[in-house]
Design a protein with these regions (language model features):
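A short, Lys/Arg-enriched interface patch at domain edges and termini
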Residues: 53-74
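A detector for short, charged/polar N-terminal pre-domain segments
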Residues: 1-7
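The alpha-helix within a helix-turn-helix
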Residues: 12-16
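Ordered hydrophobic segments in well-structured contexts
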Residues: 8-10, 55-56
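Major-groove DNA-recognition helix of helix-turn-helix-type DNA-binding domains
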Residues: 17-56
Length: 74
């Protein structure tokens, strides 16, 4: 699925647009370093795209990422 066809959110606006109101630095960390899953040990990174110098994710990408993490920690 192409991130560009989804509801884009500038990472700088994540506090007002994403569930849980994560800070910009937290979203950047999730995108760059990811979160290691408890069951598999895999690192799950939040999908991002740069448009110019602005980093974007999407509501749908956040949902997919959080679903993967939920499975890892249940």
């Amino acid at each position: 699925m192409s991130l560009l066809r989804e509801h884009l959110v500038a990472v700088s606006q994540s506090k007002t647009k994403l569930p849980g109101k994560p800070s910009e630095s937290t979203v950047r960390r999730w995108a760059k370093r990811g979160v290691r899953g408890k069951k598999s040990g895999d690192v799950h990174k939040l999908e991002i795209r740069y448009i110019g110098s602005t980093m974007y994710t999407s509501i749908e990408a956040f949902e997919r990422w959080s679903e993967r993490l939920t499975e890892e920690f249940l």
